Every structure is written in C-alpha cells, then in structure tokens.
Amino acid sequence: MKKTILVTMLFALISTFAFAAKKPKYITPVPKNGQIVIKKSQLSKDASYINYSAGGVSVQLIAVIADDNTYRLSFNTCQSCNPSPNAYFAQEGKNLVCQNCGNQFTMNDVGAASYGCNPAMIPYTQTDSELIVSTEILEKVAPAFKRWQGPVD
C-alpha cells in the first residue's frame, strides 16, 4: 500500500514538471544605427518575443527556428484581427494561437506568408550569427500596434 502511494506521488510530481508550461522568452534589443540585432544563439524552436518601442508604442516580433532549421521572423499580430487589443499570438504547445480568434499556426508558418491570419512577415537580413531588422520598418508598422495589448515580459 505504501509503495503504491509512493509511486503515485512520484508519478504526479514528474507529470507536473513534464507538462508545466514554459515561460515565454522576451528579448528587448537595444536599437543602434537604425536597426535592432537579434542574436541567433538566443533563439530556439520555441517562440521568442522581440520587443521594440516605437515612440511609446510596443511593437513585438516573433522569432523562432523552424523545423528545417531556418530562422523565422514575423510581427506578433494577427492580420485579420488587428486592431483588436488581443490580436497577438501566444505559444501553446508547438503552435502559435491568436488570442483573439483562436486560429493556430505552426512555428514553420512564422514569416512564411503575409495574408489572412498568419503572423505577418517582416523584411530582415541575417548574418551567420544575427538577424537584423531596420527600425524604420518597425516605426512604419507601429500604428498597427497602437491598440495591441500583448505581453512584453
């Protein structure tokens, strides 16, 4: 009887840690020379949320390594649901889920297309170790984020 209780408690403890939600990773690069730089070493197959302040408006990007090991980057807003304050994506399991309409996308969909509900692609360049985004682009898209209320940390 004691052995059964001990095994049950051990299983419950292991399950709690195995299925616990991962805390999202937020990165706030310091703008320099008209661009922000995201270190590839900071990214993984889980979504990282890149924060930028455009004149007090929070503009957020999603950065991830796709299944084919390419780096993906997009704006963290649902194009169909914008300007809803909840038009942003949160990772649930291996998918990104719009917090307004509930549409789901895989990490491979990040930055892949710009239509409908997909996480909107953003132009960027990359080096062997970095993804580089022009702050001019971030400033131009800031009006779409005026009502956005996604988490930033």
Predicted features and spans:
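Positively charged n-region of N-terminal signal peptides that target proteins for export
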Residues: M1-T4
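Bacterial N-terminal signal peptides
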Residues: T8-S15
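Residue-level signal for mature regions of secreted extracellular proteins and peptides
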Residues: L13, Y71, Q91-K94, V110
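Sec/Tat signal peptide C-region and signal peptidase I cleavage site
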Residues: T16-A20
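N-terminal pre-ligand scaffold of iron-sulfur
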Residues: A21-A90, Y124-D153
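Iron-sulfur (Fe-S) cluster-binding segments and ferredoxin-like electron-carrier domains
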Residues: S84-E92, N103-A112
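Short cysteine/histidine-rich metal-coordination sites, predominantly Zn2+-binding motifs
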Residues: E92-C101, A112-I122
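A contiguous, mid-protein "functional segment" used to position or interact
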Residues: F105-M107, Y115-V133
